[in-house]
């Protein structure tokens, strides 16, 4: 094996750990307490042992502190058992302990013998325990060194030819952040106090600031904390109010124990989102925690030490799916006491905001029992807030700001009339602003400046998309803490230390965070039903409670009228099996109706087991499909499968053109109309050959380096048939098999879980139980689904494809002889040179196939030929010309040449703002770059760029259109930058970002055309580097020129770049670029919103 095979993966390890060495190099640096060096390798060792030692990599951040002994104090199995029991007892994250769980042993027996295995060995522990090579390593290095290796280091083992897998240590994927790139890009220009580095190729570079190290950040935090404590002690000695000071300091430490976010002073100057260093190992994301209740402190992550304010978020998911009235509003809640529930008072609200949160209302013990003096002084103003809340007429404000349009009685019974009756986010903001003005006393704002700044954040928050979020740092930006006298311990003017300002800032951030996350979000949930909609990306619609009630009632009645569900009587509900999981029904608005979504929600053991069994069923069906692809018929899962089909057709069609007939058919209500009997038959037929087969289920993580997107990670779950060999169960054999199948190369893999106790008959039994026992609750009634499958299940698409694949194998078996059939779940597309075959296929589907529940929707049927009798045979369908761009699943196919382009008409009337989820990151520039690069990789698909499938003219047009859309996304991202960051503050960085995207697009285009000469430095080939760069220049100039004030510092650089490229390209190639950039071909983009 050459060293070059491992260079990429070793670079990954070196970027994650301070020290990365082979086991041989690690052993050479060990000096025992007895005075001699470790001798791991000896001349008499076998070649396999030497290769093993040189193929094990030891990674750590610190050196071995204690001087080890070379003695053997216990056997290797005893040492392994001691390490595993210690890890589980101390609850430490370590790959070695994955799969090792304590059996049903009493606690006394566990503590009695730590040198005995108290759980089943699996995964890494089983691999090490059964390895004679590791026993030899332990014998030569001693117990102390082996314990240090397995308990404190991260050890990786080579899996030839180019991967490694982790066997112990904290999982490596914890050190890879997906929110920020690994580069040091910042939004501000470089400072003279910092060193700079070069990025890009040759002279195309930009000097940007390096991020600080993690150690420096932690050291500065400790220093600030020590200084704060010293100054606090000084003030305590000097203060006359010694008792009140002591209380305040007690609250300070109590709040630290409650993991409240501490806001840095730099946040107030607007630098928090710009100058934070990109840590190698970021704090855990708050999204890992379950969503809190309404009004709860969702910005508290529970992490310790507390996260900085730039990493504490309030999410728009908090106000989705509410609309339950004001009785659940946080200020209308009552506190449970020994004497019974009572209304909130000022003191209760202070505790709700600054201390316990919502658990306080449920009777949780008060901490501290007496409010400190500073907080005690706040009670009157918060009491006035409650009084103003009880006097506020929310309903009249709601009717005035968000009125309901009066409809006729006939229109009130139609979904098409009620669906558009949603309130614009701006109207919702006006309602919230009016309520905030009426309820919050002026004293709490401190100044009109603070009030207007908070209103601005509320307006942006309500206009956000479904997965957007705002950080506490962004919420506190430009807020003047000194304007708020209620934060002070004493109302007298005078000097105070920086720690006092930091403390006041933290208190104010807590209040404003509660005001947004508790009051605003709670008020929106109480008065509106906020939901996403089909075809509107992540945009949120706000429906008045009474409008949504009518919509939901109409949609449910129509759903029941289809005969797919039967109501259960109370006796039938009581007789349901104990483990029955009851689903909830939710509706999502569409253009012309409502889509029902069935979801199983809950955290109990039955729900978790149900989800696990569904995932197992899906994985087994996927494994079965991999071994027998014919089960899926003509199913395509995305653009990659479509490209494979068209690549087999297009070359022959281009060489010898012939008339092609296209038929597009969409099935109406595909999921809801599948007959249970037929579905049981299909799944039984699919799983019957493997009912006695044993399946292995492996969960693993993968880390790899992308030259343009930095370090990336992904999590996967794979199910395979077990052949009983060691290669199918060991992680090393699994990684080697992945490399043989070209699924993984130059990557670090971490096994998370492994199981081999699944059988096909178990999956078939669960599927039958799931199908017959699908129970749905809506309101106070319970129903059983007697037809169709739930739309919200992860396995629904696969079940639908298997059923339709079975139908195709029965009815359309002969199509492959003359035509090509593709189906994306329930969207059929037939391409055939035989007109009779096209008419026969269309006739069968239009007539319906009741045994499979297939009923075609005539409004979505499209053909490019007339019927047999001048169009009279198919009167209700859409007929296109023989030569046209044929629409199917967001694509446009040329019916003559089979060129493919994307259908951008679906963007008409939509805002690109809602197609992107940027979030509020402390390194927004890095997040923007990573997001745009990942989108570019997805959009530059071979389906549009492959010159064997598409003509050169079509490929150029596809490139220009996707780059033009990328420029629109770039503008949307710039508009969304937090802390008023602009391109003018660092135009070099944004120019470099555009340049990097052009380089990445060039690489993706060449990757899509492997084997073809597209262009080089001698201006040869069909698609030159300079041509793609010029397309980027033209697209970005076209979009950014419409916003000259924003990009006044960037546009001259793009014009200079454009002129240079035009000089490099010849007349012929320049004409090709201008042909693709013709404004007449960009009509689809005119209706797009940004």
Curated annotation (Swiss-Prot):
Pfam family of the protein (one): TERT_C
Basic and acidic residues bias: start-end ranges: 218-232, 252-262
Mutagenesis / variant outcome for changing residue 477 to F: No effect on RNA template binding
Location of the Reverse transcriptase domain: 569-893
One GO term of the biological process aspect: DNA strand elongation
EC numbers on record: 2.7.7.49
Sequence motif: TFLY, positions: 316-321
Effect of residue 376 to A: Impaired RNA template binding
Compositional bias of kind Basic residues: 190-204
Keywords: Chromosome, Magnesium, Metal-binding, Nucleotidyltransferase, Nucleus, Ribonucleoprotein, RNA-binding, RNA-directed DNA polymerase, Telomere, Transferase
UniProt xrefs under InterPro entries: DNA/RNA_pol_sf (IPR043502), RT_dom (IPR000477), Telomerase_RBD (IPR021891), Telomerase_RT (IPR003545), TERT_C (IPR049139)
Swiss-Prot/TrEMBL catalytic activity: DNA(n) + a 2'-deoxyribonucleoside 5'-triphosphate = DNA(n+1) + diphosphate
Region (Interaction with RNA template): 371-376, 477-503
Result, substituting residue 355 to Y: Impaired RNA template binding
Tissue expression remark: Expressed at highest levels in gonads and brain, and at lower levels in heart, spleen, kidney, gill, muscle and skin. Detected in embryonic stem cell lines before and after differentiation. Isoform F is expressed in gonads, with higher levels in testis relative to ovary, but is not detected in other tissues. Isoform B is expressed predominantly in testis. Isoform C is up-regulated in embryonic stem cell lines after differentiation.
Family the UniProt entry places it in: Belongs to the reverse transcriptase family. Telomerase subfamily.
Role according to the record: Telomerase is a ribonucleoprotein enzyme essential for the replication of chromosome termini in most eukaryotes. It elongates telomeres. It is a reverse transcriptase that adds simple sequence repeats to chromosome ends by copying a template sequence within the RNA component of the enzyme.
Complexes and interactors: Catalytic subunit of the telomerase holoenzyme complex composed minimally of TERT and the telomerase RNA template component (TERC).
The protein, known as: Telomerase reverse transcriptase
Species, as recorded: Oryzias latipes
Gene from which this protein is expressed: tert
């Amino acid at each position: 094996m050459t060293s070059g095979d491992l260079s990429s993966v070793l670079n990954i390890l070196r970027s994650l750990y301070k020290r990365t060495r082979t086991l041989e190099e690690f052993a050479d640096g060990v000096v025992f307490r007895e005075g001699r060096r470790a001798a791991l390798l000896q001349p008499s060792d076998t070649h396999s042992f030497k290769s093993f030692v040189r193929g094990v990599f030891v990674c750590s951040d610190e050196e071995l502190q204690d001087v080890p002994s070379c003695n053997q104090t216990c056997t290797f199995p005893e040492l392994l058992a001691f390490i595993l029991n210690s890890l589980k007892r101390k609850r430490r994250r370590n790959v070695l302990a994955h799969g090792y769980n304590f059996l049903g042993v009493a606690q006394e027996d566990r503590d009695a013998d730590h040198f005995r295995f108290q759980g089943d060995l699996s995964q890494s522990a089983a691999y090490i325990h059964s390895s004679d090579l590791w026993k030899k390593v332990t014998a030569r290095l001693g117990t102390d060194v082996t314990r240090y290796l397995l308990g404190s280091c991260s050890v990786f083992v080579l899996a030839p030819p180019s991967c490694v897998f982790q066997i112990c240590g904290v999982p490596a994927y914890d050190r890879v952040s997906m929110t920020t790139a690994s580069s040091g890009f910042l939004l501000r220009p470089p400072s003279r106090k910092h060193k700079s580095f070069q990025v890009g190729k040759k002279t195309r570079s930009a000097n940007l600031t390096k991020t600080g190290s993690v150690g420096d950040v932690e050291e500065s935090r400790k220093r600030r904390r020590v200084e704060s404590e010293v100054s606090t002690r000084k003030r305590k000695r000097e203060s006359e109010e010694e008792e009140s000071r002591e209380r305040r300091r007690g609250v300070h430490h109590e709040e630290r124990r409650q993991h409240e976010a501490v806001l840095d002073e730099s946040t107030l100057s607007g630098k928090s989102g710009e100058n934070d260093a990109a840590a190698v190992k970021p704090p855990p994301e708050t999204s890992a925690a379950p969503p809190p209740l309404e009004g709860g402190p969702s910005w508290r992550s529970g992490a310790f030490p507390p996260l900085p304010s730039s990493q504490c978020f309030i999410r728009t998911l908090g106000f989705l799916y509410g609309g339950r009235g004001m009785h659940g509003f946080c200020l209308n809640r009552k506190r449970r006491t020994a004497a019974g529930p009572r209304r909130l008072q000022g003191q209760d609200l202070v505790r709700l905001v600054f201390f316990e949160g919502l658990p306080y209302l449920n009777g949780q013990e008060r901490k501290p029992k007496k409010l400190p003096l500073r907080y005690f002084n706040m009670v009157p103003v918060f009491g006035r807030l409650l009084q103003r809340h009880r006097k506020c007429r929310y309903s009249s404000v709601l009717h005035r700001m968000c009125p309901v349009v009066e409809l006729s009685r006939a229109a009130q019974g139609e979904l098409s009339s009620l669906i558009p009756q949603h309130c614009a986010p701006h109207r919702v903001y006006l309602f919230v602003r009016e309520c905030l003005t009426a309820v919050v006393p002026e004293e709490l704002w401190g100044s009109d400046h603070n009030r207007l700044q908070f209103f601005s954040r509320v307006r942006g928050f309500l206009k956000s998309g479904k997965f957007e979020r705002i950080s506490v740092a962004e919420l506190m930006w430009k807020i003047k803490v000194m304007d708020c006298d209620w934060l002070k311990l004493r109302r007298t003017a005078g000097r105070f230390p920086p720690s006092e300002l930091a403390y006041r800032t933290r208190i104010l951030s807590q209040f404003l965070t509660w005001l947004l996350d508790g009051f605003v979000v709670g008020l929106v949930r109480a008065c509106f039903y906020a939901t996403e909609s089909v075809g509107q990306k992540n945009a949120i619609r706000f429906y008045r409670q009474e409008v949504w009630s009518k919509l939901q009632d109409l949609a449910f009645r129509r759903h029941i009228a289809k005969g797919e569900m039967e109501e259960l009587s109370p006796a039938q509900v009581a007789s349901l099996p104990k483990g029955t999981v009851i689903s909830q029904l939710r509706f999502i608005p569409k253009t012309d109706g409502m889509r029902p979504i069935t979801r199983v929600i809950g955290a109990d053991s039955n729900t978790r087991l149900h989800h696990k069994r569904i995932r197992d069923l899906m994985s087994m069906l996927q494994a079965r499909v991999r071994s027998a692809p014919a089960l899926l018929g003509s199913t395509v899962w995305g653009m990659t499968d479509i490209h494979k089909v068209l690549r087999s057709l297009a070359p022959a069609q281009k060489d010898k053109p012939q008339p092609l007939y296209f038929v597009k058919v969409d099935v109406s209500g595909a999921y809801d109309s599948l007959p249970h009997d037929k579905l049981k038959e299909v799944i039984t037929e699919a799983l019957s050959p493997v009912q006695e087969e044993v399946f292995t289920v492996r969960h693993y993580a993968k880390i790899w380096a992308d030259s343009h997107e930095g370090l990336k990670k992904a999590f996967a779950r794979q199910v395979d048939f077990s052949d009983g060999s060691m290669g199918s169960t060991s992680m090393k054999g699994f990684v080697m098999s992945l490399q043989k199948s070209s699924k993984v190369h130059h990557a670090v893999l971490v096994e998370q879980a492994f199981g081999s106790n699944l059988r096909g008959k178990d999956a078939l039994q669960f599927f039958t139980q799931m199908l017959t026992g699908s129970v749905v609750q809506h309101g106070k009634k319970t129903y059983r689904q007697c037809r169709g499958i739930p739309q919200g299940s992860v396995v629904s698409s696969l079940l639908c494809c298997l059923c339709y694949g079975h139908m195709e194998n029965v009815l359309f078996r002969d199509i492959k002889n003359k035509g090509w059939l593709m189906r994306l779940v329930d969207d059929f597309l037939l391409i055939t040179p035989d007109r009779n075959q096209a008419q026969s296929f269309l006739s069968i589907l239009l007539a319906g196939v009741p045994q499979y529940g297939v009923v075609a929707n005539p409004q979505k049927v499209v053909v490019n030929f007339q019927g047999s009798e001048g169009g009279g045979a198919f009167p209700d369908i859409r007929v296109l010309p023989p030569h046209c761009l044929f629409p199917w699943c967001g694509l446009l196919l040329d019916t003559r040449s089979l060129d493919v382009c994307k259908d951008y008409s679906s963007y008409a009337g939509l805002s690109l703002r809602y197609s992107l989820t940027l979030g509020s990151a402390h390194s927004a520039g890095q997040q923007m770059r990573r997001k745009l690069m990942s989108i570019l990789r997805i959009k530059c698909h071979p389906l549009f760029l492959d010159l064997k499938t598409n003509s050169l003219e079509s490929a150029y047009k596809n490139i220009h259109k996707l780059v033009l859309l990328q420029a629109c996304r770039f503008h949307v991202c710039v508009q969304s930058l937090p802390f008023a960051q602009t391109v003018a503050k660092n135009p070099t960085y944004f120019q470099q970002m555009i340049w990097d995207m052009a380089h990445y697009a060039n690489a993706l285009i060449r990757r899509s055309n492997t084997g073809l000469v597209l262009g080089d430095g001698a201006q040869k080939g069909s698609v030159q580097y300079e041509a793609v760069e010029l397309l980027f220049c033209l697209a970005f100039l076209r979009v950014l020129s419409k916003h000259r004030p924003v990009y006044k510092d960037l546009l001259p650089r793009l014009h200079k770049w454009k002129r240079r490229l035009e000089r490099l390209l010849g007349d012929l190639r320049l004409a090709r670029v201008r042909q693709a950039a013709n404004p007449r071909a960009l009509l689809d983009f005119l209706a797009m919103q940004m």
